[in-house]
């Protein structure tokens, strides 16, 4: 049975050696946008689990949050340390396992993670552990791949041939995510989706060309003069509807303890 293991992530970050954060796609600002829409993080104690590059945690620290980042990949923590020093903010970095957090019950006002829950065949132990360290009334933000997207097909094909970078990964519909939150003792309060810009095909093409022939396409190509404004207007209109959450590549949701 395939699974996502620590060595997959160590290999991922080893491959990223020598890259700066400017070479790694961010999440388009969606995590910060949604957090600031739901709460004011100033003064809050915040934990990011599986922090990766720590970009969002660093931005939250700038906004006045008291931030802790946790990851079990040493290279990830090195990146966060370097970036937080450049930004001139204080971020606490902890090496650890998201299934066994080294914090007492009720330690945090906000816990969040992205690209994490989908790598566990049984997500409930992790969710319950994250709920454990939330204060009463605290918020958990979970950001995961959305089930009904062509990304899912390509991902499962790669997994079938043992070519998926993370070893194994699943996906969720927004309804499934909300049901998981309820089962973990949370009340879902807010959901959102993201279509990914630039799209998956462009990102894959850029990576292939860089690795094979050394061509470095721009990370964010200029939108076409006519199509760009139309596309933005469509996304703004349709993105306000719950039905859009069944078309996006990723979804996220908040649950309150």
Predicted segments with their positions:
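Conserved N-terminal segment of class I S-adenosyl-L-methionine
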Residues: 1-100, 104, 110-114, 127, ...
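Short low-complexity, flexible loop/linker segments enriched in glycine and/or proline
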Residues: 82-86, 157-158, 203-207
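A short His-aromatic
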Residues: 115-119
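Short alpha-helix
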Residues: 169-185, 191
């Amino acid at each position: 049975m395939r699974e996502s293991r620590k060595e997959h992530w160590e290999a991922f970050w080893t491959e990223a050696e020598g890259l700066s954060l400017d070479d790694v796609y961010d999440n388009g600002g969606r995590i910060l946008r949604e957090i600031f829409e739901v709460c004011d993080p100033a003064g809050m104690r915040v934990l990011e689990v599986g922090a990766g590059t720590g970009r969002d945690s660093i931005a939250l620290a700038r906004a006045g949050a008291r931030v802790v980042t946790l990851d079990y990949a040493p290279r990830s923590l090195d990146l966060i340390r370097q970036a937080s020093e450049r930004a001139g903010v204080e971020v606490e970095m902890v090496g650890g396992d998201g299934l066994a957090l080294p914090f007492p019950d009720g330690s945090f006002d906000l816990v969040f993670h992205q690209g994490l829950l989908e790598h566990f065949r049984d997500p409930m132990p992790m969710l319950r552990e994250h709920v454990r360290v939330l204060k009463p009334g605290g918020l958990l933000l979970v950001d995961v791949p959305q089930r009904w997207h062509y990304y899912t097909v390509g991902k499962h094909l790669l997994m079938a041939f043992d070519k998926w970078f993370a070893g194994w990964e699943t996906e969720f519909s927004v309804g499934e995510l909300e049901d998981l939150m309820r089962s973990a003792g949370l009340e879902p309060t807010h959901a959102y989706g993201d279509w990914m810009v630039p799209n998956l095909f462009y990102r894959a093409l850029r990576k292939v060309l860089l690795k094979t022939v050394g061509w470095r396409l721009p990370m964010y190509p200029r939108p076409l003069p006519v199509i760009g404004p139309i596309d933005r207007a469509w996304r703004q209109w349709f993105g306000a509807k719950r039905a859009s959450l069944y078309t996006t590549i990723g979804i996220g949701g908040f649950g309150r303890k």
